[in-house]
Amino acid sequence: GLGDVYKRQPAPLAYAKLNGKELNILELWHGPTCAFKDMALQILPHFLTKSLKKTYDGKDAVILVATSGDTGKAALEGFKDVDHTKIIVFYPVDGVSPMQKHQMNTQEGNNVTVCAIKGNFDDAQTGVKKIFTTPEISAKLEANNMLFSSANSINWGRLLPQIVYYISAYCDLVNAGKIAMGDKINVVVPTGNFGNILASYYASIMGLPINKFICASNSNNVLSDFIKTGVYDLSLIHISEPTRRRGI
């Protein structure tokens, strides 16, 4: 069960020194697919099914996911064989690593489907958005007692568990004597689409003492450039790091 998944994982906060400075690192790769997104995608399906029972009279959810690699596998693993859900993952045929492609195409589960598309991640995401907003498709689902949902970070259920681990990490620092309650910390997040660092911002609004949010980026630096300049530059850069590979 879900509880067993988390019980057998080590505490995510680790301590390290870099250039003589102490860092406190959240190890978020202890989930079943070794992606940090497991932290949210292992519990999101259960949030969703509870919500369906309360608000949609038992409808089934069809989950659409666009992925550049790691989200797809983590979402498939999270939703596999979860009652009242079906999941379809779309990925760019030449835009994921051979390992990720193998992981997705060999995914077990009676409710999972994987589709390769021509184009890049943005093409996959645009296609998913088009499906979401096509009335005829939504009407067909409604007629079959189904509705669409997403496992991408546009879904609040993805952000909620991430807020929790920032607060948990702060409490761990206090308990370990690294900081005193109320001390402010800096949060550094390697980010591709701002979802993870946005969760830390929401945690700060809820009262977590954060001094700075540092958005770390590679050559796909649209977010750091946007924060510095206010200009959102649309360009496509292919990189090898899946969690920060975006057609931007």
Please provide the spans of the model-predicted regions.
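N-terminal entrance/gating region of PLP-dependent enzymes' catalytic architecture
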Residues: G1-C34
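Short, small-residue-biased leader/transition segments that mark boundaries at the very start
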Residues: L2-Y6, E241-T243, I248
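Well-ordered mid-protein domain cores that form the structural environment of catalytic cofactors
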Residues: N24-D81
